[in-house]
Regions:
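N-terminal topogenic module of multi-pass integral membrane proteins
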Residues: 1-63, 69
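Helix-coil boundary and interhelical linker segments in multi-pass alpha-helical membrane proteins
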Residues: 34-41, 91-106, 152-159
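Structural signature of hydrophobic alpha-helical transmembrane segments
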Residues: 40-53, 100-115, 136-138, 163-166
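Membrane-helix exit/interface motif
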Residues: 58-65, 84-98, 121-125
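Membrane-helix interface "capping/anchor" motifs
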Residues: 62-70, 124-136
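Helix-adjacent hinge/juxtasegments
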Residues: 72, 76, 80-110
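Alpha-helical membrane segments in multi-pass integral membrane proteins
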Residues: 110-121, 132-152, 157-178
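Short, highly charged, low-complexity non-transmembrane loops/tails of multi-pass membrane proteins
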Residues: 187-190
Length: 190
């Protein structure tokens, strides 16, 4: 019939696992770098752009389509955080334009402090989701941002913030794996 629209079933899996894998890999390697396990930041920046940034933003966009405002917002803004953080670290090298001055420690302290506040507000919302591991991931993410702020304020050693970031990454990887396992009927506590 003319003017008739057919809607196909768009049921799909949750993109949240991809977002948590993105956070997990990027945070794990950033944590290891900050703990002094290696000194080459190239791989960490690549992880931050591709997995931390793009994977989380794409997961967020897909969650917007599913009507999941919390998941969409969290993955999208934190994905853009990884992209912004990468730009801040690459801009002084002149990769995108003429070399720029490196961000000052105080500016980075306030940058990470603001993200810690936003993460904490989102953590409150996780209490209503009903998945305890999501709350755990957000709590350690809060601690990651606040510990990085303290590093940039000059009151906390970078290695401690690195350890907290590593824990964030590992918790996020566990959650991502649990979501995937659960989707195929394997029970994993989360």
């Amino acid at each position: 019939m003319e003017g008739e629209v057919t809607i196909k079933d768009t049921t799909a899996g949750s993109p949240a696992a991809v977002g948590f894998y993105g956070l997990g890999f990027a945070a794990t390697f950033a944590g290891l770098l900050n703990m002094g396990m290696f000194s080459d930041a190239t791989m960490v920046i690549a992880m931050a752009i591709t997995l931390g940034g793009l994977a989380e933003v794409l997961a967020g966009i897909q969650l917007f389509k599913k009507g999941d405002t919390f998941g969409a917002t969290a993955f999208t803004i934190f994905g853009f955080w990884w992209l912004a953080f990468s730009y801040i670290n690459l801009a002084p090298a002149g990769l995108f334009n003429a070399p720029m001055a490196a961000a000052s420690a105080p500016s980075m302290a306030y940058f990470t402090l603001m993200w810690g506040i936003i993460a904490t507000l989102l953590t409150i919302a996780t209490l209503k989701i009903g998945v305890k591991m999501i709350t755990v991931v957000f709590i350690v993410l809060d601690l990651t941002f606040f510990s990085l702020a303290l590093v940039f304020f000059g009151v906390l050693p970078l290695g401690i913030a690195g350890l907290i970031t590593l824990v964030t990454g590992l918790c996020s990887l566990y959650l991502a794996n649990a979501l995937v396992m659960s989707s195929v009927g394997i029970k994993v506590p989360f």
